[in-house]
Amino acid sequence: MAEEGERKKIPLVPENLLKKRKAYQALKATQAKQALLAKRERKGKQFRFRRLESFVHDSWRQQRDKVRVQRLEVKPRALEVPDKHPLAFVIRMERIEGVSLLVKSTIMKLGLKKLFSGVFVKVTPQSVRMLRTVEPYVTWGFPNLKSVRELILKRGQAKINNKTVPLTDNTVIEEHLGRFGVICLEDLIHEIAFPGKHFQEVSSFLCPFLLSVARHATRNRVGFRKEMGSPGYRGDRINQLIRQLN
């Protein structure tokens, strides 16, 4: 009975063996992490084979861009502002792989880095020239106050300290735009809808608007074009597209 009552002694593991085991586990974890990083790096550096047709298509795109820009130079009326409106809204509708360097740099200057992103632009001769340069890849027109308000209220975001912040706090707006007389969301909407002398500062405070487009819709190019319309200038009809994508 005494033997049954005795507790079984658990064999103790030497301390030096425990240290070795812990060091071995840490080494294996480090090696696994390094292997994962190396795998990702190899995957990112994979060669991408392109068909001959893609080079031909890129060359055709660049030539078309070059001819279009040359036509703008010899046809001054093409650069005239279509209507007396102070504000335009631009939406990128096409991919820009293989386009000319001028078109790509203009797209980046407008801030349209992502497909179906949109920005507000103050209508000037310089901005109209930029829009005409990239017209086959964007659609643009003149938004009304209702469209401006709905876009900012629903999708308005600001980039602060490399972080995207939704426009839900007037304190943030006043902190960054107060010196321009913009202290709340209503002031911001008014400054965008009716561009004043501080339009550039206020629009730079806003992130590009990422609009809502179903993935399956973009795959069906024929149906998508029929529903969304073609790129280019569309005047007041841009408001209908904003309602559709907002």
UniProtKB/Swiss-Prot annotation:
<dbReference type="GO" id="GO:0005840">
    <property type="term" value="C:ribosome"/>
</dbReference>
<keyword id="KW-0687">Ribonucleoprotein</keyword>
<feature type="modified residue" description="Phosphoserine">
    <location>
        <position position="54"/>
    </location>
</feature>
<dbReference type="Pfam" id="PF08079">
    <property type="entry name" value="Ribosomal_L30_N"/>
</dbReference>
<dbReference type="GO" id="GO:0003723">
    <property type="term" value="F:RNA binding"/>
</dbReference>
<dbReference type="Pfam" id="PF00327">
    <property type="entry name" value="Ribosomal_L30"/>
</dbReference>
<dbReference type="GO" id="GO:0005730">
    <property type="term" value="C:nucleolus"/>
</dbReference>
<dbReference type="InterPro" id="IPR039699">
    <property type="entry name" value="Ribosomal_uL30"/>
</dbReference>
<keyword id="KW-0689">Ribosomal protein</keyword>
<dbReference type="GO" id="GO:1990904">
    <property type="term" value="C:ribonucleoprotein complex"/>
</dbReference>
<dbReference type="InterPro" id="IPR018038">
    <property type="entry name" value="Ribosomal_uL30_CS"/>
</dbReference>
<dbReference type="InterPro" id="IPR012988">
    <property type="entry name" value="Ribosomal_uL30_N_euk"/>
</dbReference>
<dbReference type="InterPro" id="IPR035808">
    <property type="entry name" value="Ribosomal_uL30_euk_arc"/>
</dbReference>
<dbReference type="InterPro" id="IPR016082">
    <property type="entry name" value="Ribosomal_uL30_ferredoxin-like"/>
</dbReference>
<dbReference type="InterPro" id="IPR005998">
    <property type="entry name" value="Ribosomal_uL30_euk"/>
</dbReference>
<dbReference type="GO" id="GO:0001825">
    <property type="term" value="P:blastocyst formation"/>
</dbReference>
<dbReference type="InterPro" id="IPR036919">
    <property type="entry name" value="Ribo_uL30_ferredoxin-like_sf"/>
</dbReference>
<dbReference type="GO" id="GO:0000463">
    <property type="term" value="P:maturation of LSU-rRNA from tricistronic rRNA transcript (SSU-rRNA, 5.8S rRNA, LSU-rRNA)"/>
</dbReference>
<protein>
    <recommendedName>
        <fullName>Large ribosomal subunit protein uL30-like 1</fullName>
    </recommendedName>
</protein>
<dbReference type="GO" id="GO:0003735">
    <property type="term" value="F:structural constituent of ribosome"/>
</dbReference>
<keyword id="KW-0597">Phosphoprotein</keyword>
<dbReference type="GO" id="GO:0005829">
    <property type="term" value="C:cytosol"/>
</dbReference>
<comment type="similarity">
    <text>Belongs to the universal ribosomal protein uL30 family.</text>
</comment>
